[in-house]
């Protein structure tokens, strides 16, 4: 019970920051030697975060849905990661990347990318009028968020900063 409370707390905090909540769940579970930490538990915790967002932002989401073009672009950008995630789960490959070495490398690599975007002052604003080409680009790069250590929001923000 304590491990579920701790993992829920970590998920609740990490999900809303541009850091990988999945990597933090793995790190906490490894550090405390939790035996039941699995992909199924991670998915359950992510679903809990998703439901919390829907409840909290219900009115905003209804207004957001009225902007059909932006809504469509966000849905479109989610398709690559959903399809790839499904394939990785069905083939069992997802379990091979859920480890501390992957977390270390992805954190290092994407930290460097973020540093580069900061160093070169890549300050792009995410506007409602970004192109469908940009939508696809960001969607494809979100596939990388399937690796623990890569934040989905972090990779989307970093990718957007590199757009023309």
Language-model regions: role of each:
Residues 1-164:
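Multi-pass membrane proteins that catalyze or facilitate reactions on polyprenyl-/lipid-phosphate substrates
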């Amino acid at each position: 019970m304590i491990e579920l409370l701790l993992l829920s707390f970590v998920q609740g905090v990490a999900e809303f920051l541009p850091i990988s909540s999945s990597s933090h769940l793995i790190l906490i579970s490894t550090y405390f030697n939790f035996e039941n930490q699995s992909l199924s538990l991670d998915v359950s915790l992510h679903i809990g975060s998703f439901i919390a967002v829907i409840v909290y932002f219900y009115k905003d989401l209804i207004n957001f849905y009225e902007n059909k073009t932006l809504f469509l672009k966000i849905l479109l950008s989610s398709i690559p990661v959903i399809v790839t995630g499904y394939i990785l789960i069905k083939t069992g490959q997802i379990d091979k990347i859920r480890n501390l070495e992957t977390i270390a490398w992805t954190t290092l690599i994407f930290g460097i990318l973020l540093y580069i975007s900061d160093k070169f002052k890549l300050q792009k604003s995410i506007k409602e009028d970004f192109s469908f080409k940009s939508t696809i680009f960001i969607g494809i790069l979100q596939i990388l968020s399937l690796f623990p250590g890569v934040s989905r929001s972090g990779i989307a923000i970093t990718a957007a900063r590199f757009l023309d």
